Amino acid sequence: MKYERCGKSGVLLPKISLGLWHNFGDVNDYNKCREIIRYAFDHGITHMDLANNYGPPPGSAEETMGRMMQDDLRPYRDELFISSKAGYEMWAGPYGNWGSRKSLMASLNQSLKRMKLDYVDLFYTHRYDPETPLEETLQTLVDIVRSGKALYVGISRWPYEATQFGYEYLRQRDVPCLIYQGRYNLFDREPETTGVLQQAKENGKGFMVFSPLAQGLLTNRYLNGIPEDSRIANGGHLKKESLTETTLKRIKALNDIAARRGQTLAEMAIAWFL
């Protein structure tokens, strides 16, 4: 595995990380999850990316990670870089969502308990909160680092101007933002058009890509219809409406290009952003 410096920090991260968004919850077979995580770690994927609401159900991916720490990974904690996030709806009531100090602090405490950890290496604000003052959210990140519950902090899916404010706020308090996370793939190049990709580079931040395969659209999974065990068929975040006739034509065209390159579509999609 090749490792790359994260922006202008001292952190080296693997070129490919393992995200535990949809396939590591209670609805999935634990032994299969365990096999995947062990395989990734054995091949140099040291970064495991989670969030409080990953599952399904919400929280269960972190519980899976906690079982892995207990069963296999505890002796290797210092070789792992584990991230989590908070900002999407997690529990009922006014404090289980968004970016208030109350919500972020409570969420991180719950995440640490589920994962059986004393700290996370990286904690993100998971999305922009238009109602909570930016200063409140950002100062909470500062205080989380100073409390020792996270070593670094990151921003995920914030708009350009709010992100720039966040970079400056955190830098001035000696808790610089390590990384920006955004969805980026051959079908979704929004980080280019909004400017947040270039912004991260100019500010010396890393950029973490999520959904590089567009939840499986950029693979051979849907070339010949919708498989019964696919994410679309299971009615999750990827809707049947996503696979339009136009999209399918694009998938097949990209698959042809990949074949001429001697690659699978998934391999080409990952190579594109690497």
Where are these regions (language model features)?
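Phosphate/pyrophosphate-binding loops at sites that engage ATP/ADP/AMP, CoA/4′-phosphopantetheine
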Residues: 73, 109-118, 262
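Beta/alpha (TIM)-barrel catalytic core signal, keyed to glycine-rich beta->alpha loops juxtaposed to Asp/Glu
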Residues: 130-274
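Alpha-helix N-cap and loop-to-helix initiation/capping positions
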Residues: 28-32, 60, 64, 95-103, ...
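N-terminal small/glycine-rich loop or linker at the start of catalytic domains
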Residues: 7-25, 83-96, 119, 124
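Short, well-ordered coil/turn segments that N-cap beta-strands
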Residues: 11-16, 44-46, 74-80, 117-121, ...
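Short, acidic/polar
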Residues: 27-41, 99-115, 163-167
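Conserved, mostly hydrophobic/aromatic
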Residues: 6, 18, 33, 40, ...
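N-terminal binding-site loop/beta-alpha segment at the start of enzyme catalytic domains
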Residues: 1-80, 146
